[in-house]
Each structure stands twice: as structure tokens, then as C-alpha cells.
Amino acid sequence: MHPTLISAPISSSANDAHAGTSQGSHQGHRIQVIRRDGSSTPLNIGKIRAVVDWACLGLEVNSIALEAGLTTRLREGISTREIQDNLISCALEMCSPNEPDWRYVAGRLHVWSLWKDTLVRRGYQYGQYLRTVQTKVTNGEYDSRILTYSEGELQEAGCWINSDWDTDYDYAGAVLLTSRYLLPNELPQEALLTCALLLASVEAPDRRLQWARRFYESIAARRISLATPILANLRVPGGSLTSCFIVAMEDNLESIFGEITNAARISKNGGGVGVNVSRIRATGSWVMGKPNASGGVIPWTKLLNDTAIAVNQGGRRAGAVTVGLDVWHLDVPEFLEMQAENGDQRRKAYDIFPQLILPDEFMRRVINKEDWTLVDPYEVREKMGIELAELWGEQFEGAYREIESNLDTTITLYKRINARELFKQIMRTQVETGMPYLSFKDTINKANPNKHLGYIPGTNLCCESFSNVTPGQDAHCCNLVSLNLANLDLQDIAGVSQIAVRMLDNTIELTAPPFADAKSHNNKYRTIGVGAMGLADWLAKRRLNYDELADINRLFEEIGYWCTQSSMELAKERGAYPAFPGSDWQKGLLIGSKPVSWFQANAAKPERWEKLSNDIQTHGIRNSHITAIAPNTSSSLVQGCTASILPVYSRFFYDKWAKGTVPIAPPFIGNCFWFYPENKTMDQRKVVKAVAAIQQWTDTGISMELLFNLNAGIYFPEEPERSLNAKDIFDTLVMAWEAGCKAIYYIRTVQKDDFKDSSDGCVACAN
């Protein structure tokens, strides 16, 4: 990364570095500058030059150019804040693919402004951490659990703070960190240190400072990225630290409204939630014995939609809900039209994220162009005693064929449709809206280590986290962090994985679950999700291509092994998760419920996997699910790396923010420009192959977006007039299922005649 700075030119008083009493001139006369405290003083060009030199130190930029750009914007009565903003604007305007380091200059200047504002408001910057903690606990801003540490321990911890870490952010990262995550009068390293101390507060008193320092250094050096709920909520009283939830509705009012209430509680705390509605009776079904009385799943989905809008994550943004429906449900055709502009607006839900759950039997019929039967779960349940939503694999296939053999005799409410035609309708909706998400139910459940206690109905909001869900008993919940691969080498994986797993296991003790079913799941399964971001950076730094599957396999084997091994070591220390007896883990199966023989045949280091299997059978494992790769669209900007495990959309582009146009580029663009393949021109089959390779070493899921460029000549250079067609997209989606991917998140498209150069805004993957 970029070199850190030994010290910044910060004055000990609240005066600004842009102003002072020394002689300074501009255009032949002395300009008066308004300081942050409201006083006036002559402009001091020397101090401006010192700040500019500091912001440019060690970067491949010309500081004189920045100073020259500023001088044209100086005027009588200008404030030091305006000078600072003008410096930032100049730096951003000079940023380009040839000079990408200007975004780091702008980031440092933004942090400088934060330091100065904090000095003015509270009278000190870094150096008085104990005072900060005491003040914020008194004001109700910090959780009082931080005071389980003694004053001496807090003073010692304050000495770990390294303000140079603040200067490693580019402008996008600095702005996001300060605007989204910091409390009033709080500096970045204070926030990160407080998180680390709280994460370690559940450790043994004689070891917690040791762990707190390891946590802090991993977070502050951006080797581990905390998920938004942890970074935003851990410091505040009563915060939920959980990112992902899944609930399921029974076919009765008590369950339906109970889960809507639970979704509201989740949204209030900033989490995203998946809601499975497959048990709910279809449109035209019976209600209290009356035929053709049910309105189906759409009215309940609309209620969830409106709940997400009303309970807006503490005023930060609208809630986020994905509604999952099994593809055999009679309401699937209307579900696919639920976000179309035409039709009855009372049966529309534009703000939720639809998800379809697909069994293998459906996919086989799609490939073979066979018929598919849509049925009413209520009629099937009442007349045949089958709860179809709970079945998967061979059990589902047998029950489904039995249902089909009883059409017209027993089952009267149904619809026959060609499976291929239904899949085409799904694809059309995806191209138009990006959704529905697709969850491959059998693939997900075959890899479920807790089959002995239930099944997985679908995925969470981002399609990477899922485990058993039982309506009214257990609601899936998972706490997340991600490894920042841009800042890691292979030899770092073991140590950082141990820290990440331990951190997340501690969050289970610290979080405040928003409802009883979530607490029950937390206690029973202890599900966590260690993810990854910056794969594109890791590959580019090593001059590797995105289709270098052997290297990708080696990297994620290390992550999978060390995260699993770390959870086993925690079980030695703290005990196995309560649902471990009878699980696939106890039977000696490993990641994805695969036997040791698979690892002996496919792993780079097969012998360690056999030992790990034996150790887990002997000692247990602390967490039922351990790894899950989230999309990380925003948090990757704070981390200064590319999002998740996907290629970059574009090597360099400008994003439109409230603060103006912001340049976005990967960290190693200066030296590795051509080793960042652009997703907007990449054959998406390469993405599927890479995700499938990573999935082998990931026990939960991966947020896999697919981006299809519909312009001519992109994928077929030998046929410049040819553009992607429906069959190409169809083949890619089927390939994802066949390759063992568990879900497909968004389908993005670059529309015809809307193709942008790298320097233009990102039009296809804005989040």
C-alpha cells in the first residue's frame, strides 16, 4: 500500500494550518482568511504548502500542481474550510488512470479536515483515549461494557493508536468511513480501537488486552473488514451486530404477522432479511372452507414491502427484504410480474427483492423442455399431507411426482407449464429488473451440515448466508467479517483467519438479537461468515488472470482450511456448538458436507484435511457455518480494495455522490493496470467457473452477480456484429447450477447503445 506518514503538520492549538500571522501574499496584497473558530488572520501560503506537501508525501503526484490549482481559487474572506474543500476538489479533478494517486491526496486532505474539526469541537485530537471513552459513555454514545476495562487498561490501549493509518484511505474510503460510521466528535482510530476492545471484552481478563491489540491492528491495517452492523452498532448501547437473517412464514395469520413484526425489528437494527413465503396458500385457494377466497402470497409480500419502507433502518435507508418463493408455487407467474409497471398497483411490490427457490428437478426439466406443475401448498397439505416447502432432493422429487400423479383426482388447483418457457420468463424479468435472485435449493441443502435438525428454505438478502430455519423457533442469523485480500499474502491467511473466526464467535456473545427466534438460532448453531474481498487485487498484484483457477483454488483452500481449523481450536477452548451432535461435522464430513476422500483427491495439502476431520470428530467445532462471501459493495471502498471476489466493473470510473463526482479505482491500478480485467467485457462463464472453484472451499454461499453486456462485438471479436442473445444467458445460468454454485444474486446488464468507456460513470452495477 502507500507509505504511512511519520507525522502530520498539526498545530497544538485550534488554529488552522491554512492561516497564521506570518507574512503571506497573494496577487500583491494580503488576503484575510476566516478560521474555523470565526477569527480572521492573514493568509499564510507557507502553511498551505506544508499541508499540500504532507498530503502528497510518498505518492506519485506533483504537489506544485495542486498548489497552483488552488491559487486561482483564493479570494478575500475565504474560510479555511473553503481552502480545504478547494484543495480536495483540485486533487479529485487531477485524478486520472495515469495519475490515480490524487485520490489518496484527497483522502488525506479529508482526514486532515476531520482532525481539525475535532480539535475545534472538543479541544484535542488523538492522545486522550481514556477521556474520549469516559465522555462518550457518560453521553450514552458508547456501550458501558467498554468500562469493564480498567482506566489503566484503556490508557494502555490508547497508546496503540497509530494516526498514520488514517492517511491510508483514498477519498471514497475516507468519506464513507467518516460519514457513515463515525459518531460525533470521534476519530477513525478511536472507533476502530473501541470496536476491538469490545470484541475482546468477552475474553479471559488476563488475555483480553492481548486479543484486543491483535483485533485492533488487523482492523486498523485493513486486513479484516468488519461488516456494517458490527462497525456501526458495536460501540452503541444495545446494538445488533448481525448482518443476515432468514425467517419463514407458516400459513396462518399469527405466523404471518409475527414474521412481519420480526422483519420490522431486523430492519430497525440495520439488518437485511430473507422471508420465505412458500407455505402460504395460493391465489384462489380456500379460506375457512370457502373456495377461491385466498389472495395468495402477493398481498403479504406487499405488506413486507411497505414494512421495509416504513422501518427505515434508524432513518439511514429503507429496509432490505428478499421474499423467497419455491418455483412450484401456483403464484410464481404473478410473483414474476410483481414489479412490472402495468397491472393492478395494489398487487405490486417495487421495493422488495424477489427470490425464486429452484430444485434440481426443475432445472432438469428446463434442460429437457419438460412440463412443470404449479400447485397450491394448502391443497397439497390438506389433501395429501405433504408440506412441500420442507422437502428437497429425493424426498421432494418423490412427493412431487406423487402430486402430479394425483392431478384432477385429488389436486384440483394447479397449472401445467413448460419448464423451459417458465425459465425464459424468469430470464426476461432478470434482464429487465436484475431479479429474481435464484437459489438452488438442493445444492444448498446437500451441503448443509445440520440436516439432522432441519432444512434451509432459501438464502438471505445477499445470497451468501443461510442455515436451518424453523418458523416460530429458529430464524437464521449470521455475523460477518471479510478478509481484505489486497493486503494479505498466502502466509498471512492462517493468522488472520484465526483472528477473524475468534472475533465473530465473540460477537455472538455481544450482540442483542432483535427477537427470540434469532436468539435461539444464535445459541444453537453459532453461525458466522468469514468472507473475502479484493480477489481482483490479489490476482493483479501477482500478475495473474481471473481464469487462473489453480491459484484461486490454492488461495481459497487456505482460507477454508484455516477458518475451519480455527473454529475447531475454539471448540477445544469453549466447546462445540450445541447442535453439533448428529451433524455432518461429527460424522467426519468437512466443508460442504464432503467426505475426506474429496479433499484427498482435490486439495493441495490433502494430509492436513484428514487430520482436521479427525480433530473435529474428537473435539467438535465451534460454529456450524464458518465462511460466506458477501458482496461488500460499499465496505470495499472503505477498505481500499475491489468488491468481493468479482472482477472490477471498470478499471477507472467516476461515481456521482452527494459531495460531487468521485474517482473510483482499484489499489494497484498504477502498476498492474492491464491485470485488472473489466467485468463489463468479460465472458461471464469465467466468473461462474471462478465462483464454482471458490464455492468448493466455502461452506455457506457466495454473492455471485453476473453482468451481461448486450452490445455487439463484446464477446465475439471474430463476429463484430454479433451480440449476446437469450441462449447465451440461458447457457450461463444453467452452467452455474451444473457447476455447483448455490445461488445467483443480481443479473446486471449493459444495455445496447449504453456502453460506457472506463472513464464514465458505472451504469450497470451501482448499488
UniProtKB/Swiss-Prot annotation:
One of its GO terms (molecular function) is ribonucleoside-diphosphate reductase activity, thioredoxin disulfide as acceptor. GO terms for cellular component: ribonucleoside-diphosphate reductase complex. InterPro entries: ATP-cone_dom (IPR005144), NrdE_NrdA_C (IPR013346), RNR_lg_C (IPR000788), RNR_lsu_N (IPR013509), RNR_R1-su_N (IPR008926), Rrm1 (IPR039718). The record marks 244, 478 as: Important for hydrogen atom transfer. The gene is nrdA. This is Ribonucleoside-diphosphate reductase subunit alpha. Residues 9-26 have a biased composition (Polar residues). It is an enzyme of class 1 (oxidoreductase).
